[in-house]
Amino acid sequence: MKAYFYDNLPGDQRLPHDSGKEVTVAELEKVGVLYFRFPDVEGVNTLAAERGYKNRDEIIVSPEKMGAIYETKVRQFFDEHLHEDEEIRYIRDGAGYFDVRNEGDEWIRIKLVKDDLIILPAGIYHRFTTDDTNYIQAMRLFKEEPKWTPLNRTEGLDENPYRQEYVTQFLKAQAEQA
């Protein structure tokens, strides 16, 4: 895993866009993002039991697997959105980027590779893309039945109760500590 501020320069979303300003695991935790590295599935199973993740599936995002819809799907994943559930991904192969917003509404880019596991809290604005290899295989973990319902960032979404809870728990807490 490598985390840094996104450079916001134009160009292919699958390129690194590395500003050169590193972000630590502790800084990720301040915005509610949890990172783990598990060389085998046993560690994932233990975490799943501890956190109540009852269901899982696997997804491969690649042109070979997805065919003609690949480019459309990758652009869709890159639309800024939030979920009303935690988003948990364990990378089985390949690589990709999760971008998350910090308390200053800046993008933090998180590159994940094989054996990395990330947990994004409900209500965090984020987006995803593969890297320039155009391939990632990930295990998705869920507390309940598998679902992936993105709520794209629009005017008024900040009033969503899951967004409000996220802001209170993480962003306002940071502002009060500053």
Curated annotation (Swiss-Prot):
Cofactor: Fe(2+); Ni(2+)
Disulfide bonds: none
Pathway: Amino-acid biosynthesis; L-methionine biosynthesis via salvage pathway; L-methionine from S-methyl-5-thio-alpha-D-ribose 1-phosphate: step 5/6
Keyword Iron attributed: yes
UniProt KW keywords: Amino-acid biosynthesis, Cytoplasm, Dioxygenase, Iron, Metal-binding, Methionine biosynthesis, Nickel, Nucleus, Oxidoreductase
Positions of Ni(2+) binding: 81, 83, 87, 126
Annotated GO MF terms: acireductone dioxygenase (Ni2+-requiring) activity; acireductone dioxygenase [iron(II)-requiring] activity; iron ion binding; nickel cation binding
Location(s), subcellular: Cytoplasm; Nucleus
UniProt xrefs under InterPro entries: ARD (IPR004313), ARD_euk (IPR027496), RmlC-like_jellyroll (IPR014710), RmlC_Cupin_sf (IPR011051)
Bound cofactor: record note: Binds either 1 Fe or Ni cation per monomer. Iron-binding promotes an acireductone dioxygenase reaction producing 2-keto-4-methylthiobutyrate, while nickel-binding promotes an acireductone dioxygenase reaction producing 3-(methylsulfanyl)propanoate.
Catalytic activity: 1,2-dihydroxy-5-(methylsulfanyl)pent-1-en-3-one + O2 = 4-methylsulfanyl-2-oxobutanoate + formate + 2 H(+); 1,2-dihydroxy-5-(methylsulfanyl)pent-1-en-3-one + O2 = 3-(methylsulfanyl)propanoate + CO + formate + 2 H(+)
Coiled-coil boundaries: none
EC number(s) recorded for this UniProt protein: 1.13.11.54, 1.13.11.53
Main location: cytoplasm
Binding site for Fe(2+): 81, 83, 87, 126
Keyword Metal-binding: yes
GO BP annotation list: L-methionine salvage from methylthioadenosine; methionine metabolic process
GO cellular component terms listed in the entry, alphabetical order: cytoplasm; nucleus
PANTHER family: ACIREDUCTONE DIOXYGENASE
Stated family: Belongs to the acireductone dioxygenase (ARD) family.
Known function: Catalyzes 2 different reactions between oxygen and the acireductone 1,2-dihydroxy-3-keto-5-methylthiopentene (DHK-MTPene) depending upon the metal bound in the active site. Fe-containing acireductone dioxygenase (Fe-ARD) produces formate and 2-keto-4-methylthiobutyrate (KMTB), the alpha-ketoacid precursor of methionine in the methionine recycle pathway. Ni-containing acireductone dioxygenase (Ni-ARD) produces methylthiopropionate, carbon monoxide and formate, and does not lie on the methionine recycle pathway.
Annotated HAMAP family: Salvage_MtnD_euk (MF_03154)
Name by which UniProt lists this protein: Acireductone dioxygenase
Organism listed in the record: Neurospora crassa (strain ATCC 24698 / 74-OR23-1A / CBS 708.71 / DSM 1257 / FGSC 987)
